[in-house]
A protein has these predicted regions:
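Hydrophobic h-region of N-terminal signal peptides that target proteins for export
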Residues: 2-10
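Gram-negative (and chloroplast) outer-membrane scaffold detector with strong preference
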Residues: 38-42, 68-156, 222-236
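Predominantly the C-terminal beta-signal and adjacent terminal strand-loop region
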Residues: 88-90, 176-236
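Extracellular loop and loop/strand-boundary signature of outer-membrane beta-barrel proteins
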Residues: 50-55, 102-111, 156-163, 213-219
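Transmembrane beta-barrel domains of bacterial outer-membrane proteins
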Residues: 20-25, 55, 65, 82-85, ...
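Residues that define the transmembrane beta-barrel architecture of outer-membrane proteins
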Residues: 30-32, 59-65, 112-118, 134, ...
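Short glycine/proline- and aromatic-enriched beta-strand/turn motifs that initiate or cap beta-hairpins
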Residues: 11-71, 223-236
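A charged, solvent-exposed segment within the mature domains of Sec-exported extracytoplasmic proteins
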Residues: 129, 133-189, 193
Length: 236
């Protein structure tokens, strides 16, 4: 007796433990989201000492405002814009660094700068469970920034100042998590892990000497300085 067998291979779906297309979407089509983050810090040092730095007398502040808006053109997918404004100031009256028998000092130094950034955003969500309260997301950012700043040092024999302009063009990927605190208000946490950017800097020293530098970088790296926490309101 001759037995003929036929075998066929069939691709099988692998379940990774989360549902990417739930019966009802985590983020419905047509939803608008608006939100962002802001931060303000100020410091005043009066004869303060920190390790080898003594006699610090300074004032300064940092301001950061990062609004964004996203429109969800498909279920669990959205596009939008992210704007950023950052400003910082440091007025150092005096400070000394003492290491062994070596002492160096600085006085009458001033620095101020501000930066504008604008990025287009594409966002995709991966829901966690069926409760529709928590999800992972990934933001793909394309845009750039422009920065202006000046430093002034009157502590030497002659006063010296430097004016700086800088720009950045970049493509970045920022994954994160979102958790709804109410039906429409959500807390978001994201961090940069991948980026490709081109940056350049122009300097004018004492309104006479010119300087220039540029750089290009690309790679995977967790950027702890890019960790962002903010609130967003969703118009469902």
């Amino acid at each position: 007796m001759l037995v003929l067998g036929a075998f066929c291979a069939e691709a099988q779906h692998y379940d990774r433990g989360y549902e990417t297309v739930p019966s009802s979407p985590f983020m419905p089509k047509g939803t608008w989201a608006a939100g962002g983050s802001m931060k303000y810090t100020q410091h005043i040092n009066d004869n303060f000492s920190l390790m080898v730095i003594n006699g610090i007398n300074s004032t300064g502040y940092n301001v950061s405002v990062h609004p964004k808006v996203i429109y969800h053109f498909r279920e669990n997918m959205g596009v939008g814009l992210r704007f950023s404004y950052d400003r910082s100031m440091l007025d150092l009256a005096s400070a000394e660094i003492s290491v062994a028998d070596i002492t160096m000092g600085a006085k009458d130094c001033y620095q101020i700068s501000h930066k504008y950034s604008l990025h287009g955003v594409y966002r995709a969500y991966i829901p966690l469970g069926n409760a529709k309260r928590i999800a992972m997301f990934a933001d793909v950012l394309l845009g750039g920034s422009f920065k202006q700043g000046k430093t002034f040092n009157a502590g030497g024999t002659y006063a010296a100042g430097t004016y700086t302009t800088a720009g950045v063009l970049e493509l970045a990927v920022d994954p994160g998590m979102i958790a709804f605190l109410t039906d429409r208000l959500a807390l978001e946490l994201n961090v940069g892990i991948f980026g490709v950017n081109y940056s350049w800097t122009n300097q004018t020293h004492n309104q006479v000497d010119m300087g220039y530098t540029d750089s290009t970088s690309a790679g995977f790296m967790v950027n702890l300085l890019s960790i962002g926490v903010g609130l967003s309101y969703y118009f469902l």
